[in-house]
UniProtKB/Swiss-Prot annotation:
Location relative to the cell: Nucleus
Role description: Calmodulin-binding protein that functions as a negative regulator of osmotic stress tolerance.
Name under which the protein is recorded: Calmodulin-binding protein 25
Presence of the UniProt keyword Acetylation in the record: no
Name of the gene encoding the protein in the UniProt record: CAMBP25
Record's keyword terms, sorted: Calmodulin-binding, Nucleus, Stress response
Motif (VQ): 125-134
Organism of derivation: Arabidopsis thaliana
Positions of region (Disordered): 68-87, 201-220
Main subcellular location: nucleus
Composition bias, Polar residues: 68-78
A Gene Ontology cellular-component term: nucleus
Pfam hit, one: VQ
């Protein structure tokens, strides 16, 4: 059983010999370190003074310069000296570019549909419509300007398509009002019957009911009560 009796009588030099350390080295080492620390504190508190040859190395290493401090801090952060210098130069260039000239943005294509506006007064609105729809251009300084005069189209009549002449308008159908002709059909039949009454071979048209007339050969032909229809122009003549 291990006891602690008799440990007080053991000399301390036995432990020092067990670690292979001399007693005179320990005292000198600590005294030298204490001296260096005292001088370093004295140089940081007081003004700089003339360095002695014995403490020149310690003072030069103890006093830190701003450039070396920056270098050490940057090295600890993980970047080398050339990279730090290059990065600072790039930042300065970027600052100068942004301050001197603003970066241009590319123009985006507008998504709005292009709308064409046409200005026209109420006075020349019809001429504007003809121009937009493709009216013919004429070089004339008339009241209509550069456009053809606005003309109402001629109505297409059925009488113009019939093979009859312009004087005989009784074979055409009336265009607008048929009731006027139906009310005066008796006078029309009388006029047509008088025109053909001189010819014996022609057939006379009665004024009332339909009838048949016999020719010398004995043949009979029955005619309708309304054989022809006049046009509007024939009413003026009547």
């Amino acid at each position: 059983m291990v006891t602690s009796e008799g440990l007080a009588s053991v000399d301390s030099w036995l432990y020092r010999q067990g670690f292979n350390v001399d007693s005179w080295l320990l005292s000198d080492t600590f005294s030298h370190d204490n001296d260096l620390l005292a001088r370093a504190l004295h140089t940081t508190v007081t003004a700089p003074h003339t360095l002695t040859p014995s403490s020149a190395f310690f003072d030069s290493s103890a006093v830190s310069h701003p450039s070396s401090t920056n270098t050490l801090s940057s090295t600890v952060s993980g970047a080398s000296d050339p990279e730090i210098i290059g990065g600072g130069a790039k930042r300065k260039r970027n600052c100068l570019l942004t301050d001197g000239k603003a970066a241009k943005r590319r123009a985006r294509a507008s998504k709005k549909s292009q709308t064409t506006f046409i200005t026209a007064d109420p006075s020349n609105f019809r001429q504007m419509v003809q121009q937009v729809t493709g009216a013919k251009y004429i070089d004339d300084s008339s009241s209509f300007g550069i456009f053809d005069p606005i003309v109402k189209p001629e109505p297409l009549r059925f009488v113009n398509k019939l093979p009859c002449g312009p004087s005989d308008r009784s074979t055409a159908v009336p265009m607008l009002d048929t009731s006027a002709f139906l009310s005066n059909h008796h006078q029309e039949n009388l006029a047509v019957g008088n025109a053909f009454s001189g010819n014996s071979s022609s057939v006379g048209l009665p004024s009332g009911k339909p009838s048949a007339t016999a020719d010398p050969g004995g043949s009979a032909v029955e005619f309708d009560n309304y054989p022809t229809f006049p046009t509007l122009e024939s009413w003026k003549v009547m």
